[in-house]
Amino acid sequence: MKYPVGIQTFDQIIERGFVYVDKTDMVYSLATEGKIYFLSRPRRFGKSLLLSTLRAYFEGKKELFAGLKIDALEQDWHAHRVFHFDFNGINFTESGALNRVLDSMLSEWEREYGIVTDVPQEYGLRFYRILQAAAEQTGRGAVVLVDEYDKPLLDVLEREPELLDRNRDILKAFYSVFKQADASLRFVFLTGVTKFSQVSVFSGFNQPKDISMFDKYEALCGITEEELYTQFAEPIREMAESDGCSEEEIRLRLKRHYDGYHFSEGMTDIYNPFSVLNALDSRRIRDYWFTSGTPSYLIRLMNHFHEGIDELTNKYYLPDEFINYKADVEYPLPMIYQSGYLTIKDYDKDSNLFLLDFPNNEVKSGFLAMVATNYLQCRMPLESWMVKAVFALKRGQLEEFRKMLTSFLAGIPYSMRRKDNEPERERYFHYTFYLLLRLMSVYTVLVEKEQSEGRVDCIVETPQYVYIFEFKLDGTAADALRQIEEKGYARPYESDARQLYKVGVNFSSKTGTVEGWKCRR
């Protein structure tokens, strides 16, 4: 089986015999049931391939679709003029870059249709005349496809406020052509990571239909579990043989590491296509999607966010709280969700609330490592420390874990842990410990878990051990351990067969590390 790793052109995939997960029935629905659409999906999730498929369809390339679902649906196969804007791979951080890109594309099309302008005109008006000319020449409405419509904004987000405003104004004027040129248009499809509420393409009449959370199109990009098990049964079997395990074990590993995305209340399981194809191609389960690059705009945004990531994850939200992004508001939830680092995990119909959390282990470990590295700025390599810490907890070696934690915290610069008041200092140590433990994603880590007798600071559950931690800042480890006993935090685990450890920890705000540690079995 040939995997289209790094190939996003529908023509190449079909002509060169690469495996293709057939989404063409949904392509037909889009083409016949609407006119102007917007779809938000994370990077490397198949948006470019979708637009390439739409282009081939609207250009009437019937031979490419032989044997696919759409072959039995479409009868006419009319050819339309397709205008494809692909902003992928273009650097918009320089002033004037967006102007040059648009001018280059429009100039080429103006030459094609013999359009001559004596005076400089706005981009929207120039494109309007091009669309008119195309429709008149072909006798059919033109098709416009825009890949990563928001990249000129994301490239300068939290970096160049003035350039962000200029690029936004240019795009507002340019995308407004879809309203003016309605009679010359057959179909418009825009993709992007996020939905900027200030861009006029999402306001007024003829606005795009946002299908990002439509049940019907939830699986438009990505791979469903059914598609994985039916179309990739052979490579899963080969992977199991290579690893010396069962096919069920491979399916479970793939699910834990790459599944978990849900884009609507329909809750269809969607696997990350980039990671799945890479894993099956190499027969190795690795962090392919995350290591392919973390968006710089997200890192910059998180630098301005003063709450912990634990304040955002595993919580219920109204749709408006995570769908529309406003660039002038320092609230990263919509960007984190739409970038693919959080996803829908549950939906309560009565209250219209959505539970958001990490989709899978690849995203959770990668995102938390990024946040921890950025937040702590520790001199010790985080990945190396994490692997050894996991090994210690797995074997019940609490003393070794204590030494490692003490050493790690001592390596954090004083400037990072300097806080003005006691609640902030205590919050810093709690959050630091939370990040480190959540990184050990093979375990269940519950931070500040509510119980009938109070709130437990931290519980770590492994297959063989349960660790109950209580923290104090500038207090004593004995007081922390006494609180575990007096509050009965271990009571829910009385019938648990695993070995239980109660650990009282005292942090010193002066040294920035562990000062006291008491453990009881």
Show the residue positions of the predicted features:
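Active-site metal-binding core of divalent-cation-utilizing nuclease and nuclease-like domains
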Residues: 133-138, 439-463
